[in-house]
């Protein structure tokens, strides 16, 4: 590390919508500052997971320290990369809290999108210096002036310092580096000498345990210090080493001082011990007050995960345990289903988080899994005054005991070209949405503000929005309050037996159509047996939809050649009695594909 000067440190973040070129610009910055040699360079260098590269998204926040010579001075530039997706908004807010400035990357052809809007507002709340950057300026469809106007009018940013760049060709990259040095303020000199450091991420390393990523606000942290976490008020730990991101995590001598970004190791074994947003201080000279803004991360969406082959249960348990080491937001609880066997009830930050975990389980651990339909946390107010929070249909109490139910709602911002307005309005109406306001973003695009039940968002809202806007619509959401709703438990009965894997909590208005579609799907995927199988959807024991799988025909009179009809009748009667007995005592074997197909549909 170069000699320490707080006035020569710049901590900044990059805000962008998915696919607007954030990771590519980060790559060009690393190249221009010679942080990484050309031969070691690869696409999306900071996105370390294959999944991040394939999907073109950032899942984990990745910091990196660069040095840059400007007007005879050496500057330390700390890029604290943030996830762009709405599921990880708390991580984004903590990463932004570690910065003094941010680059707002906007695609010069597509313009401002919903998720960049959400993160810009987070940055404005923290009073960060925002530098607008128009990327992909080399595209024939680029409209720099129109998009500058959008940024000015809708976000309210001064665009006089806007930089036109192309991460692909490298145009504009030196200007970005100079703007960071000129416009982003250095960290404020600390008012106190006690150590205060903000935890903005952590990473599990199999050799050294948890690496805690910090931005030092005041004081310094060095090897041998005894530290503690202020918000969680847990045990104390000895710092075994400190390091910087160059761009790989590299141990170093000396200390991390006010304004600097780095990490420390302290023999921590569980990610749960380290909470994002917490404040690190020393035991000997503790800080008086922790940093503001700490929140416990709580899961929003829940789903059951079961191995298709029950002998893989222990492997699945191990896989989830390993994923949890690097993902404190993932919650795991063991559960048992009559139909699916032993599995886990998992909590996620949102639908993208859930998809990523599923994909990593099948990819990194080579496991075939079944996942139940995602559900949210409902509030059940009982007649005796008690309140329950449930995320699983099996926990639904007796309807006679329920006073009312409440469901979580969200505030949604949708950005869309004008021609798709009526499509979106009918989609939101179908999803029980309430329109709050409509604003013009520019001559061609609108911003629609809606309130929607979270349950309607987690099922298929994103797919349907992309479908009705031909891929041009984007949205982001933030959690609102609970509201009363007519939520009921829909049960699916196969041969008069309820199958818990198919039961779900739905709004009363949607129950009949959902029940009918599940029954119709099951008729197609369950093979016929030797007896008729009724498939029914029921609410509170009342059947609301029914389909029947016809029995396989078996010709019992095949051996009768001619002769008296009474002989055939006897055989038919005997077969009828046998089928009746089979229906009473026969078990319907439901293939795994049936579960997969129905859950895919949900």
UniProtKB/Swiss-Prot annotation:
Function: Required for accurate and efficient protein synthesis under certain stress conditions. May act as a fidelity factor of the translation reaction, by catalyzing a one-codon backward translocation of tRNAs on improperly translocated ribosomes. Back-translocation proceeds from a post-translocation (POST) complex to a pre-translocation (PRE) complex, thus giving elongation factor G a second chance to translocate the tRNAs correctly. Binds to ribosomes in a GTP-dependent manner.
Name of the featured protein: Elongation factor 4
One of the record's GO molecular function terms: ribosome binding
SUPFAM superfamilies the UniProt entry points to: EF-G C-terminal domain-like, P-loop containing nucleoside triphosphate hydrolases, Translation proteins
Keyword Nucleotide-binding: yes
Localization (cell): Cell inner membrane
One Gene Ontology biological process: positive regulation of translation
Keyword GTP-binding carried by entry: yes
Domain tr-type G: 7-188
Principal place of residence: membrane
Catalytic activity: GTP + H2O = GDP + phosphate + H(+)
GO CC annotation: plasma membrane
Binding site for GTP: 19-24, 135-138
Keywords, ordered alphabetically: Cell inner membrane, Cell membrane, GTP-binding, Hydrolase, Membrane, Nucleotide-binding, Protein biosynthesis
Disulfide pattern: none
Gene, per the UniProt record: lepA
Taxonomic path: Bacteria, Pseudomonadati, Chlamydiota, Chlamydiia, Chlamydiales
Enzyme Commission number: 3.6.5.n1
Protein family (similarity comment): Belongs to the TRAFAC class translation factor GTPase superfamily. Classic translation factor GTPase family. LepA subfamily.
Membrane topology: Peripheral membrane protein
UniProt-listed Gene3D superfamilies: 3.30.70.240, Elongation factor 4, C-terminal domain (3.30.70.2570), Elongation Factor G (Translational Gtpase), domain 3 (3.30.70.870), P-loop containing nucleotide triphosphate hydrolases (3.40.50.300), Translation factors (2.40.30.10)
């Amino acid at each position: 590390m170069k000699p320490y000067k707080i006035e020569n440190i710049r901590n900044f973040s990059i805000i962008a919508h998915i696919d607007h070129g954030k990771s590519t610009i980060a790559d060009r910055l690393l190249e221009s500052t010679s942080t990484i040699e050309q031969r070691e360079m690869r696409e999306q260098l900071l996105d370390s997971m294959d999944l991040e590269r394939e999907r073109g998204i950032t899942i984990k926040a990745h910091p990196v320290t660069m040095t840059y010579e400007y007007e005879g001075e050496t500057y330390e530039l700390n890029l604290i990369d943030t996830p762009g997706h709405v599921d990880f908004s708390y991580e984004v807010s903590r990463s932004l809290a570690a910065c003094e400035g941010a680059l707002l990357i906007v695609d010069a052809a597509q313009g401002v999108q919903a998720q960049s809007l959400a993160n810009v507002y987070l940055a404005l709340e923290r009073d960060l210096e925002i530098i607008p950057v128009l990327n992909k300026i080399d595209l024939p469809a680029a409209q720099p002036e129109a998009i500058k106007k959008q940024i000015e009018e809708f976000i309210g940013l001064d665009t006089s310092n806007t930089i036109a760049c192309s991460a692909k060709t490298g145009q504009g990259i030196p200007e970005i580096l100079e703007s960071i040095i000129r416009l982003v303020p250095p960290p404020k000199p600390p008012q106190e000498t006690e150590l205060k450091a903000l935890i903005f991420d952590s990473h599990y390393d199999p050799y050294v345990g948890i690496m805690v990523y910090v931005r030092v606000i005041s004081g310094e942290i060095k090897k041998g210090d005894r530290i503690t976490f202020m918000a969680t008020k847990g045990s104390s730990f000895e710092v075994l080493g400190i390091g910087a991101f160059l761009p790989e995590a590299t141990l170093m001598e000396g200390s991390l001082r006010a304004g600097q970004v780095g990490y420390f190791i302290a023999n921590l074994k569980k990610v749960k011990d380290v909470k994002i947003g917490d404040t690190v201080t020393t035991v000997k000279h503790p800080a008086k007050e922790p940093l503001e803004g700490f929140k416990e991360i709580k899961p929003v969406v829940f789903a059951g995960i079961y191995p298709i082959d029950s002998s893989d249960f222990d492997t699945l348990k191990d896989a989830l345990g390993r994923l949890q080491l690097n993902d404190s937001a993932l919650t795991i609880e063991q559960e048992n289903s009559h139909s699916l066997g032993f599995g886990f009830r998992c909590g996620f930050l949102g639908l993208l988080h859930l998809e990523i975990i599923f994909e990593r389980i099948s990819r990194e651990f080579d496991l075939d899994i079944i996942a139940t339909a995602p559900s949210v946390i409902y509030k059940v107010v009982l007649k005796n005054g008690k309140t329950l929070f449930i995320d699983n249909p099996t926990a639904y109490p007796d309807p006679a005991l329920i006073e009312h139910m409440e469901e979580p709602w969200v505030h949604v911002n949708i950005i869309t070209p004008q021609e798709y307005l009526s499509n979106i309005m009918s989609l939101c109406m179908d999803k029980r949405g309430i329109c709050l306001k409509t604003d013009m973003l520019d001559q061609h695009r609108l911003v629609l503000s809606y309130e929607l039940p979270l349950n309607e968002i987690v099922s298929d809202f994103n797919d349907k929005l992309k479908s009705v806007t031909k891929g041009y619509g984007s949205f982001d959401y933030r959690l609102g309050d609970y509201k009363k709703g007519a939520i009921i438990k829909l049960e699916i009965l196969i041969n008069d037996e309820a199958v818990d894997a198919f039961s779900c909590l739905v709004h009363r208005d949607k129950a009949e159509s959902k029940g009918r579609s599940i029954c119709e799907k099951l008729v197609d995927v369950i093979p016929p047996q030797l007896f008729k199988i009724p498939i029914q959807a029921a609410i509170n024991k009342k059947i609301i939809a029914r389909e029947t799988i016809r029995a396989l025909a078996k010709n019992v009179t095949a051996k009768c050649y001619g002769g008296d009809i009474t002989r055939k009748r006897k055989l038919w009667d005997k077969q009828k009695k046998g089928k009746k007995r089979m229906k009473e005592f026969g078990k319907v074997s439901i293939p795994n594909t049936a579960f997969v197909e129905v859950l895919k549909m949900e």
